Structures are given as structure tokens and as C-alpha cells.
Swiss-Prot record:
This is Large ribosomal subunit protein uL4. Keywords: Ribonucleoprotein, Ribosomal protein, RNA-binding, rRNA-binding. One of the primary rRNA binding proteins, this protein initially binds near the 5'-end of the 23S rRNA. It is important during the early stages of 50S assembly. It makes multiple contacts with different domains of the 23S rRNA in the assembled 50S subunit and ribosome. Forms part of the polypeptide exit tunnel. It comes from the Bacteria. GO terms for molecular function: rRNA binding; structural constituent of ribosome. Part of the 50S ribosomal subunit. GO terms for cellular component: ribonucleoprotein complex; ribosome. One of its GO terms (biological process) is translation. Residues 49-78 are annotated as: Disordered. Belongs to the universal ribosomal protein uL4 family. PANTHER family: 50S RIBOSOMAL PROTEIN L4 (PTHR10746), LARGE RIBOSOMAL SUBUNIT PROTEIN UL4M (PTHR10746:SF6). It comes from Streptococcus pyogenes serotype M3 (strain ATCC BAA-595 / MGAS315).
Length: 207
């Protein structure tokens, strides 16, 4: 099993933590990670685009002129697509772009991105992130003590609200729970800052 250093909030190394090789030590599957990232990005699209077809455009209920005898082409409505101000043919309608991938694929993608961060030495383990109250300055001190000055994803245990509130005003810092972190979140981060309890949760969820 791989070992990573375990730090406290002051940046002091206090111990080490063993990581499960089946989760943090596999050969990353880039193809699967790519598929999951595309899927998650598709799910983020709003899909609220809409145009009016001939039935939705106001007016046009009356036949503009009689069928025969005028010498002009026959017309049934001034809201037909060929008319100026008429309806749009085959235009976009509100829809969801999201689609689901098999659970095994999503789990393999998570294991792959976690393993990649560990292999690249971009996985920082911390004993805990406890704050008496939400304080942005206190969280900034923790990041400074751990020499983290890049885009970071902080993974905390469920119920650690003060950590999330303390970090939300800091640029380039995202906080998520270990059970809900997505592949897209992890890929977008330069480093992972993970609490000891969060590591246990990750291993419990993915094992």
C-alpha cells in the first residue's frame, strides 16, 4: 500500500496514512476519465434554448387569400415557415443534454483520477480541518502552511460545514464532501487536500 504524509493544520508532519492500492494505486484509464468528464460537462448544460414553430407563433389563423383565382401561390397561413415572421422549422427546443454512464465506468474513472493525483504527488492529506467558526482568514492560513497556492479541491467529511463556509470566498478553492466529489472536480483541480476521515469515506465508497 502507498503511504502519504499526514499533516496537521499548521503544516507540521504528524504521521503517515496508508492508501488502498485498489483505489489510489491503479493504472489510470484516460479513456474512461475522458468519457466521464464529457458526460458530466453535458449534464451541466442548461438546455433552455427554444424557438417558436408555426403553431407557437402568434397569429396566422386566417387564410391570407382565397385558394384559387388570385394568380398568386396558394397560402394557408402567414405564419408558415416561408413567411417573414413565420415559425421556425426544426428549431431547438428545451431538452436535457445529460446522459448516464454505467456505475462501473464512473467508479473506475474516480479511481483513475485519485491514482493520478497520488502518482503526481498532488495529493495532500491533512489530519482534520476543524474551525470554531467560519473564518476565511483561518482557512487561508492552513493553505499557506501547507504551501498550497494553486487551484485546490478540498475533500472533507460529511457535516463539516465550517470548512466549506470558510473556503467559499477564497479564489481557486473548491470544497466538496468525499462522497460527492465528481471526476470533473478532481480533474479541474491542480491539487487535492483531503482530510483523514475523507480518505476513509472514499475507500468505503469505492471499495
Amino acid at each position: 500500500m502507498a503511504n502519504v504524509k499526514l499533516f496537521d493544520q499548521t503544516g507540521k508532519e504528524v504521521s503517515s496514512v496508508e492508501l488502498n492500492d485498489a483505489i489510489f494505486g491503479i493504472e489510470p484509464n484516460e479513456s474512461v476519465v475522458f468519457d466521464v468528464v464529457i458526460s458530466q460537462r453535458a449534464s451541466l448544460r442548461q438546455g433552455t434554448h427554444a424557438v417558436k414553430n408555426r403553431s407557437a407563433v402568434s397569429g396566422g389563423g386566417r387564410k391570407p387569400w382565397r385558394q384559387k383565382g388570385t394568380g398568386r401561390a396558394r397560402q394557408g397561413s402567414i405564419r408558415s415557415p416561408q413567411w417573414r415572421g413565420g415559425g421556425v422549422v426544426f428549431g431547438p427546443t428545451p431538452r436535457s443534454y445529460g446522459y448516464k454512464l454505467p456505475q462501473k465506468v464512473r467508479r473506475l474513472a474516480l479511481k483513475s483520477v485519485y491514482s493520478a493525483k497520488v502518482a503526481e504527488d498532488k495529493f495532500v492529506a491533512v489530519e482534520g480541518l476543524s474551525f470554531a467558526a467560519p473564518k476565511t482568514a483561518e482557512f487561508a492560513k492552513v493553505l499557506s502552511a501547507l504551501s498550497i497556492d494553486t487551484k485546490v479541491l478540498v475533500l472533507v467529511e460529511e457535516g463539516n460545514e465550517f470548512a466549506a463556509l470558510s473556503a467559499r470566498n477564497l479564489p481557486n478553492v473548491t470544497v466538496a464532501t468525499a462522497a460527492t466529489a465528481s471526476v470533473l472536480d478532481i480533474v479541474n483541480a491542480d491539487k487535492l487536500l483531503v482530510t483523514k476521515e475523507a480518505i476513509s469515506t472514499i475507500e468505503e465508497v469505492l471499495s
